[in-house]
Curated annotation (Swiss-Prot):
Keywords: Antimicrobial, Bacteriolytic enzyme, Digestion, Disulfide bond, Glycosidase, Hydrolase, Signal. The active site is at 53, 71. This is Lysozyme C-1. Residues 1-18 form the signal peptide. One of its GO terms (biological process) is killing of cells of another organism. The keyword Plastid does not apply. SMART domains: LYZ1 (SM00263). It comes from Bos taurus (Bovine). PANTHER family: LYSOZYME C.
Length: 147
C-alpha cells in the first residue's frame, strides 16, 4: 500500500513539473518550429532566454504582484499582455491563447506566441534576455547539439 501511495506522489510530481527539456532537445524543437533566425534572433539567443526565464521547464510560473499578472511556461509569457489566465485584471490577451496552453509539453503554441511577441516588441521584451544574453557570447547554448 505504501508503495502505491509513493508511486502516486511520483506521478503527481511529474504532472506538476511538466516537461523540462534537455538543452539540445529544446534546440532541435525550437529549430523545427521555426525560431532559428526568426526576426534575426539566433537559436542560441532563444536557448539563453529560455534557460534564464524557465530553466527549460514548460510548467514554470512566476507571479508579479505589482501588475497582478503571472508569467507562464518555457518563455515566461505574461498574462497581462499576451495570454488569458482568467484572473489577471485588464488583461489584453495579445496572442489569443489560454495561459495554460503555454505550459503544455508540446510547445508549439508557446512558440507561436513568442514569435508574435518578438515580431511586435523584439527580443528585448524579455528581461532575462537583456540581463543574461544581450552582449554575451551565447554560442555555448547550441554547442555540441546535432541540429
Amino acid at each position: 500500500m505504501k508503495a502505491l501511495i509513493i508511486l502516486g506522489f511520483l506521478f503527481l510530481s511529474v504532472a506538476v513539473q511538466g516537461k523540462v527539456f534537455e538543452r539540445c532537445e529544446l534546440a532541435r524543437t525550437l529549430k523545427k518550429l521555426g525560431l532559428d533566425g526568426y526576426k534575426g534572433v539566433s537559436l542560441a539567443n532563444w536557448l539563453c532566454l529560455t534557460k534564464w526565464e524557465s530553466s527549460y521547464n514548460t510548467k514554470a510560473t512566476n507571479y508579479n504582484p505589482g501588475s497582478e499578472s503571472t508569467d507562464y511556461g518555457i518563455f515566461q509569457i505574461n498574462s497581462k499582455w499576451w495570454c488569458n489566465d482568467g484572473k489577471t485584471p485588464n488583461a489584453v490577451d495579445g496572442c489569443h491563447v489560454s495561459c495554460s496552453e503555454l505550459m503544455e509539453n508540446d510547445i508549439a503554441k508557446a512558440v507561436a506566441c513568442a514569435k508574435q511577441i518578438v515580431s511586435e516588441q523584439g527580443i528585448t521584451a524579455w528581461v532575462a534576455w537583456k540581463s543574461h544574453c544581450r552582449d554575451h557570447d551565447v554560442s555555448s547554448y547550441v554547442e555540441g547539439c546535432t541540429l
